[in-house]
Amino acid sequence: VCLSLTVMSVDPDCSPEITAMIGASIALSISDIPWNGPIAGVFVGLVDGKFVMNPTREEREKSLLELTVASSEKKVVMIEAGAKEVSDDDMYEAIMKAHEVNCETVKFINSIVAEIGKPKFEYPSCDVDHDLFEQIREYATDAVKAALDTDDKKVRDDRLQVVYADVFEHFGEIYPEMSDETVAMINECMYKLQKLVVRRWLLDEQKRVDGRRMDQMRPLNAEVSLLPRTHGSGMFTRGQTQVLTTATLGPISDQQLLDGIDDQEYKRYMHHYNMPGYSVGEAKSSRGPGRREIGHGALAERALEPVIPSVEEFPYAIRLVSEVISSNGSTSQASICGSTLALMDAGVPIKAPVAGISCGLITKPDSDEFLTMVDIQGV
């Protein structure tokens, strides 16, 4: 599915991102393409202690909160936020109010669909072969459990390779003329089996693959001043995830000029994120930044922005670069922690240290019950 969203005209008081989100939802909803929408989006600000839905440009400049919420009629599907140390209660209330507004927009979209929407086309199911899955589950469950049960990702991957090889050897005897379709189906069944094992550990035993509790973080380590010629540097390690962030200071003339659809503006605090192939054991060439690098860089930049001193207090341009040395989940959050270390090492008088951590949510089938976990890692 390809959606083309083109900004034809801009009203400074109306966010083009929200308009594009709702427009995309309408386009999919009235088409014959099956999907689980519609969804709607809204921007929430906090101005003078009151929540403002889709604030004007002037209100956004005063707002303590920049929150974008996308949701269906029943559930939230996406949250993006930046805030000047807003309380947990205020953030929760803002999300709930945003969902109420989105529900009204979804009703509006449904009324459009009722008038001009096309019937959704039918397509063949891509579910795994149930009989084959049951055979694999019976044969390989114990081996998969033993392979997954370790806190070392490399060891886990090596064990799983052995299990996969054994499964293919065993079922190669049952299906001697194994087609490409059968190979793909066995791989899909093995993935489904791993998912089933992990979900049962989480939901039934509150156990994670590395043995941690749901609220337990991996071992932490932090170092500063690792690089002798940089203005500041910080290495943050959480489990097998490791990020090295450097801080470079320059004259205010080094700030970045932003020339987008809004008025020209300057950015004196910049954060860039790089994740080379070696961090995940891949041999790949270094190209320009992709969506991951741009998105993670912006996320970590936004996390530190509220604590950066004003230009009157600290008249310098600040550039941070986070290099992912080793990745096993939560590299964006590690780059936030590394950025705090590098800024303090460079002598930047930030208002408060900032840390980041990833959180996950898992729900029970056909139930509203759920469990949350902190510090997600790769499996």
Task: List each model region and its residues.
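Conserved structured catalytic cores and adjacent interaction surfaces
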Residues: 285-289, 293-379
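Conserved phosphate/anionic-ligand binding catalytic regions in large, soluble enzymes, centered on
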Residues: 14-33, 223-247, 328-350
